C-alpha cells in the first residue's frame, strides 16, 4: 500500500510531463521514517483549489475531458487517498510568483496559507507525506524497489528526469533503454 501512495503522487507529476509541462521530478524518501516528498516543475495546482484538490472527491483538474485522456493517475482520487492515509500531509503549489500551501493531519486540514513565492521558485507542486503507521503496520520503503519503479517511469517517459535522493534517473531512448538494461542477451541487435 505504501508504494501506491508514492505512485499516486508521482503519477500527478508524470501527467504534467506528458502534457508538456516540466521535465524533472525531485523525490526525497527518508527510509528510516517513511517521509516522502515529491516536487514537480509543471503548472502547479491552481492556487485557489489546493485544499479541494487534495481533500475533496471530484475536484481535481483531471475531470476535464481534455486532460483525462492523458492522465495516468486515479483521476482526482489519488492525492486525496494519500492525504487520508497519511499522518502528515503537506501540499504547496507555485504559480507565476505566488504560492498556496496546506497542512493536514490524518486527512484533516490544520492550516493553509497563500502568498508571494521566493524569486527562485519555479511553477510546480510540492507534496510531502508520511504514511500512517496505524494503517500501514511496520512499513518501510525498500530503496531497491523504489529505484526500480522510478526506472520504469523513466523508460515509459523518455526525457523525464527523476531525481531520487540525489540519484538521477533518466532514459533518453525509452523502451529501447529498458530492453538494453534488462535483456540477458550477449548482444542486443538493432532492428533492420
Summary of predicted features, one role per range:
Residues 14, 114-192:
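N-terminal assembly/transducer modules of large multi-domain enzymes
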Residues 1-131, 136-137:
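GHKL (Bergerat-fold) ATPase N-terminal catalytic module, capturing the glycine-rich phosphate-binding loop
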